């Protein structure tokens, strides 16, 4: 599964929303993810995308849209 689809699947599971046509939607400002769901998202990304995304290094502004999450996961894969 590619990164984009994995991220969208995780977000859909956590938010109940299909964000595939809202790739620049701010998921925090719009109340789609809270702090508990954010931790769950990071755990799911680690599991499904084989990346390490520690909560301690999480900066909301770097992860606030589906596009940014995809870019961050791809960046972590290349480290």
Swiss-Prot record:
UniProt key word Cytoplasm: yes
Annotated localization: Cytoplasm
Pathway linked to the protein: Cell wall biogenesis; lipoteichoic acid biosynthesis
Post-translational modifications: 4'-phosphopantetheine is transferred from CoA to a specific serine of apo-DCP.
GO molecular function terms noted in the UniProt entry: D-alanyl carrier activity
UniProt KW keywords: Cell wall biogenesis/degradation, Cytoplasm, Phosphopantetheine, Phosphoprotein
Domain of life according to the entry: Bacteria
Domain Carrier, chain residue ranges per copy: 1-77
Annotated positions of the O-(pantetheine 4'-phosphoryl)serine modification: 35
Pfam family, one: PP-binding
Record's GO cellular component terms: cytoplasm
Family, as annotated: Belongs to the DltC family.
Protein role: Carrier protein involved in the D-alanylation of lipoteichoic acid (LTA). The loading of thioester-linked D-alanine onto DltC is catalyzed by D-alanine--D-alanyl carrier protein ligase DltA. The DltC-carried D-alanyl group is further transferred to cell membrane phosphatidylglycerol (PG) by forming an ester bond, probably catalyzed by DltD. D-alanylation of LTA plays an important role in modulating the properties of the cell wall in Gram-positive bacteria, influencing the net charge of the cell wall.
Protein name: D-alanyl carrier protein
Annotated organism of origin: Lactobacillus johnsonii (strain CNCM I-12250 / La1 / NCC 533)
Lineage: Bacteria, Bacillati, Bacillota, Bacilli, Lactobacillales
